[in-house]
Amino acid sequence: MYAPVESNEGFNFKPELPTSSAYYRLLKKLRRQVGHAIRDFNMIEDGDKVMVCVSGGKDSYTLLDILLQFKRIAPINFDIVAVNLDQKQPGFPEDVLPRYMEENNIPYYILEKDTYSITKRLTPEGKTYCAVCSRLRRGSLYGFAQEIGATKVALGHHRDDIIATFFLNLFHGGSLKAMPPKLLSSDKKNILIRPLAYVEEKDIIKYAELRKFPIIPCNLCGSQENLQRAMINEMLREWDRQYPKRLHSIFGALQNVSPSQLADRDLFDFEVLDSQRELDFKDPEELKKRLDVVNLSFAAE
C-alpha cells in the first residue's frame, strides 16, 4: 500500500523553526557540511528526483530537513520525495510519519511490506535481526526507487557510521572498507548518496532535540543492537571524549589512501617497482646490466 504523494509543484516546506542562537549556529554548521559533501561527491544534479529514506529516527529526519531547506535555496532544480518502509513491526506507530509529512507539506510514500515476519523466520535463534532486516529493507527500498523513477536514493548515515563500519570491517571482516558517500548499488540500478557523510552524530542528536522531531524508536522488533557494532560505537565515543580530534583524523585518513603503502596487489602493481627504479649512471656495470635487460625484453616482443 502506498500513501498518495503530493506533487513538488508549488513546493511549500516552511516548518516552524526554533529561534535560539544555538539552533541557528548548528543549522549553519550542518548546512555547510552537507553542502560540501554534495559538492565534493557530486551527489545531487539538476533535474534529479531524490528519494529520501525516512525511518523515523534522528538521522533520517535531519537528512530530510536539511535537504528540504537546500531545495528552497539551491541554484539547481531537483525534487524530493520521502519514503518510509513500514515493516509491520509490532507497536510501530503508523500515524506518526504521515502526520509529520502532511503537517510540513512534504511529498511522501508509505511502503508497506511485512519484512518483520520474514526476518524472524530467517534469523537463527540467538542472533540479532539486524543483518537480515537491513538486507530486506534495502531490497524493498531500492526496488521502489525504480518504480517511482528516483534518480538518487539518499540515506541517513553520518560520519560516525562511516568510521564505525570501517572498524567493523577492519576488526571482524579482514578488509579496509567503510561506507562511501556515493555508491552505485550492487544491481547497478540505483545511485546511493549519504549527504550527512561529514556530519558528527552528536550534532545530529542536538539538532533533532532542537527541532523536536517525533522520533520513532528503532528497537521495536525487540532485537538488541549488533554487539560488535555497539562495542565499536562505544569505543568511538570514548575516543571522542578523550581525544576530540581523533575521529576527525580517522575520517580524513579515509580520504587520503596510499595504495603503495598497503599490501593489496590488486590496487598496486608491486612487480613493476624494479623496472621503475632510477639507474645509478655513475656505475657503468650497473648501467650495462640494466640496458641488457631492457634489450632482452624488446627482443622478446
Swiss-Prot record:
Pathway(s) per entry: tRNA modification
EC number: 2.8.1.-
Span(s) of short sequence motif PP-loop motif: 55-60
A cellular-component GO term for this protein: cytoplasm
Cofactor: Mg(2+); [4Fe-4S] cluster
EC top class named in words: transferase
Reactions that this protein is recorded to catalyse: cytidine(32) in tRNA + S-sulfanyl-L-cysteinyl-[cysteine desulfurase] + AH2 + ATP = 2-thiocytidine(32) in tRNA + L-cysteinyl-[cysteine desulfurase] + A + AMP + diphosphate + H(+)
GO terms, biological process: tRNA thio-modification
A Pfam family matched in the record: ATP_bind_3
Primary localization: cytoplasm
UniProt: [4Fe-4S] cluster binding residues: C130, C133, C221
NCBIfam families per UniProt: PRK10696.1
Similarity-based family: Belongs to the TtcA family.
UniProt-listed HAMAP family: TtcA
Stored PANTHER family: AMINOTRAN_5 DOMAIN-CONTAINING PROTEIN (PTHR43686:SF1), SULFURTRANSFERASE-RELATED (PTHR43686)
Complexes and interactors: Homodimer.
This protein's name: tRNA-cytidine(32) 2-sulfurtransferase
